[in-house]
């Protein structure tokens, strides 16, 4: 481990502001009203307001990574007679399929391939053919490739077929404007260390209260019982059932303040989008090609094909970039040799320019 700080060009954990880090210097008591009412309850209200102005929604915080919350929703929202259609076009959709299988949840996996946009007509046909499907689950920003999936079109199908709609918005909520009521989303899942620019330690679910209230007794897990966690927070004014990650929560409260100071989700989305466009333009000028067509890209992370030069090794490229203060991500696509660069967090136009200069310097195979 080194004391040197790097700029993380990853989809989270990501580079955070100095003030978000400093917020963790305070120690909180998990029984204290100053913490539970003054911090946790405020966060819950702010998250719900960020998601929609409509009534009837609530939020629940849950210890662990984003995958913990995804598993909590799947394991709590689906009763023993329910069945979920899981739309999968990457590692995170595939993870939902794996979770459902391990929990014994009836499911239909629609796998459209890692570089293909989900076919809404195909989803329509599946729903039409199988009336036993009660829920639909999908990822919004699939960071395996950087693809932004059509949650609006699938949401319209969920409304038409009267299905409960679950969206993993891990790498989009807080960075892409959305109204979950207008999108017909019943459960939206995200994490502290993504677009809101906090640090790892907890995830959260913003849910239609009527749906969440019907989940009692469904959970396949004690710790991941979303209904029980919600009732504890509701009945005890922000109290967590088990140990609260207090320092992470304080950092997140500060991150929410900084989101508002930046101009809210719309302003942050504009920054992320400009970062991504500048990154792609600069990488293409250096000779790199994107895995996806431009119209499929999210403003969060971009996958680039690895150079075909036989001298190229990602590990060496990574090392040379890290020496210059930049950290990127390896590829996760099974059928293509690629690497990924994220552009969220405390990353601005000057950082993208500096990164591109560092990449040019690190391209040892061209020398």
From Swiss-Prot:
Transmembrane segments annotated in the record for this chain: none
EC code(s) of this entry: 2.6.1.37
Cofactor(s) demanded: pyridoxal 5'-phosphate
Record-linked InterPro entries: Aminotrans_V_dom, NH2EtPonate_pyrv_transaminase, PyrdxlP-dep_Trfase, PyrdxlP-dep_Trfase_major, PyrdxlP-dep_Trfase_small, SP_NH2Trfase/AEP_transaminase
UniProt keyword terms in alphabetical order: Aminotransferase, Pyridoxal phosphate, Pyruvate, Transferase
Any one Gene Ontology molecular-function term assigned to this protein's record: 2-aminoethylphosphonate-pyruvate transaminase activity
UniProt enzyme class: transferase
Reaction it catalyzes: (2-aminoethyl)phosphonate + pyruvate = phosphonoacetaldehyde + L-alanine
Pfam families hit by this protein: Aminotran_5 (PF00266)
One annotated GO biological process: organic phosphonate catabolic process
N6-(pyridoxal phosphate)lysine found at: 194
Keyword GTP-binding listed: no
Record-stated family: Belongs to the class-V pyridoxal-phosphate-dependent aminotransferase family. PhnW subfamily.
Subunit structure: Homodimer.
Task performed by this protein: Involved in phosphonate degradation.
Cross-referenced PANTHER family: 2-AMINOETHYLPHOSPHONATE--PYRUVATE TRANSAMINASE
Protein name: 2-aminoethylphosphonate--pyruvate transaminase
Organism: Salmonella paratyphi C (strain RKS4594)
Species lineage: Bacteria, Pseudomonadati, Pseudomonadota, Gammaproteobacteria, Enterobacterales
